[in-house]
UniProtKB/Swiss-Prot annotation:
HAMAP family cross-referenced by the UniProt entry: HisA
Pathway linked to the protein: Amino-acid biosynthesis; L-histidine biosynthesis; L-histidine from 5-phospho-alpha-D-ribose 1-diphosphate: step 4/9
Similarity comment: family membership: Belongs to the HisA/HisF family.
Gene3D superfamilies, A to Z: Aldolase class I
Transmembrane stretches, start-end: none
Domain of life: Bacteria
Catalytic activity: 1-(5-phospho-beta-D-ribosyl)-5-[(5-phospho-beta-D-ribosylamino)methylideneamino]imidazole-4-carboxamide = 5-[(5-phospho-1-deoxy-D-ribulos-1-ylimino)methylamino]-1-(5-phospho-beta-D-ribosyl)imidazole-4-carboxamide
Keyword Lipid metabolism part of the UniProt annotation: no
This protein's name: 1-(5-phosphoribosyl)-5-[(5-phosphoribosylamino)methylideneamino] imidazole-4-carboxamide isomerase
InterPro entries, per the entry: Aldolase_TIM, His_biosynth, HisA_bact_arch, Isoase_HisA-like, Isoase_HisA-like_bact, RibuloseP-bd_barrel
Keywords: Amino-acid biosynthesis, Cytoplasm, Histidine biosynthesis, Isomerase
One Pfam family cited in the UniProt record for this chain: His_biosynth
Length: 250
């Protein structure tokens, strides 16, 4: 089980939001690259970046901070990024800068042809971010609920050739209420590509619960507010996940 620290970028700073509300941002660091180094030193094997301004603006907005993070740790571990990615040129530029994966969310739902083109042009580097509430997909920085069922879109995007799916329960994100295990497993069973859980991770019990269903196709989990607030010790959580994996393999 891959535990992936999230670095959410707003105005060049590392922040956390509550349920995607830009007005409810807590600043955790004014040096995102230093924060990236911190998580790598704590044992992170991948980083998850979100350009929050970009997600709302529909185009990249925190490129300096993103490049600084890639320069700091991109040679050591994979770095993935979502937010404001709406065209192939942006994807190409980010991959050339050293990103390992780009995450397409709203644009995949609104313009499936773009996702299909991205998967064709940059195979192995495209992750789809599906954000949902009560099984319905949300777009535009979570501000709009669609009528699309998560599993239906996931199967469609799998056919396009995306690498994996990040599934975020937006009713829980930033609320420390626990991962929606049931919904995540349901999605993982609907597709053959890996699913990464997101939204609500709060403690070691969540890690244990996820590890129990890892073989359903759940590759990892995004770690957000809990590792910043101190509710979850990241290094201890990754160690626990590794130990549980080893005991399962034994």
């Amino acid at each position: 089980m891959l535990l992936i620290p999230a670095i959410d970028l707003k105005d060049g700073q590392c922040v956390r939001l509550k349920q995607g509300d830009m007005d409810q941002a807590t600043i955790f660091s004014e040096e995102p690259a230093a924060m990236a180094r911190h998580w790598v030193d704590r044992g992170a094997r991948r980083l998850h970046l979100v350009d929050l301004n970009g997600a709302f603006a529909g185009k990249p907005k925190n490129e300096d901070a993103i490049r600084a993070i890639i320069e700091e740790v991109g040679g050591e571990i994979p770095v993935q990024l979502g937010g404001g990615i709406r065209d192939l040129n942006t994807i190409e530029r980010y991959l050339d800068d050293g990103l390992s994966y780009v995450i397409i969310g709203t644009a995949a739902v609104k313009n499936p042809g773009f996702l299909q083109d991205a998967c064709t042009a940059f195979g192995g580097h495209i992750i789809v971010g599906l954000d949902a509430k009560d099984g319905k997909v949300a777009t535009d920085g979570w501000s709009k609920l669609t009528g699309h069922e998560v599993a239906d879109l996931a199967r469609k995007f799998e056919d396009y050739g995306c690498e994996s799916i990040i599934y975020t329960d937006i009713g829980r994100d930033g609320m420390l209420q626990g991962i929606n295990i049931e919904a995540t497993v349901r999605l993982a069973r609907a597709v053959k590509i890996p699913v990464i859980a997101s939204g609500g991770l709060s403690n070691l019990t969540d890690i244990e619960s996820l590890c129990e269903v890892e073989d359903e196709g759940i590759e990892g989990v995004i770690c957000g507010r809990a590792i910043y607030s101190g509710d979850l010790d990241f290094a201890a959580a990754q160690t626990l996940a590794d130990r549980l994996r080893e005991s399962d393999d034994a």
